[in-house]
Amino acid sequence: MLYLDYGRQDGQWVPNKYGDNKNLEAIEFFKHLNSVIRGRKDGAIIIAEESTAWPKVTKSPEEDGLGFTFKWNMGWMHDFLEYMKLDPYFRKFNHNKMTFGITYCTSENFILVLSHDEVVHLKCSMINK
């Protein structure tokens, strides 16, 4: 929702009023929705499944963020699954797959997930990965 050109070819989308690909209406929608939910003070948690490098997903709208409580760390999931596929002997040469996330882990309020996307549409079970 954040990008006007996501999943589209050239000519299939129209730039915003500033000439870029940000979906300004979607950005304002998320900011407003998350402000309302956070304002209720009932302990609701709002989690973004956002796989791009969009900045400030978990910052408050007052800080020009989208206002989500947490963001999935899709990079960690990918690296973790790749690491686990390796023969245990070769893992010692690939520990960077498990430690790379430390370089950006404080940029957002991340949660570590194993996505349902990894097992749907005739993909194998998580245990077989």
PLM features: residue spans?
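Conserved alpha/beta catalytic core and glycan-binding cleft of carbohydrate-active enzymes
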Residues: G7-K129
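Short acidic catalytic loops
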Residues: M1-L2
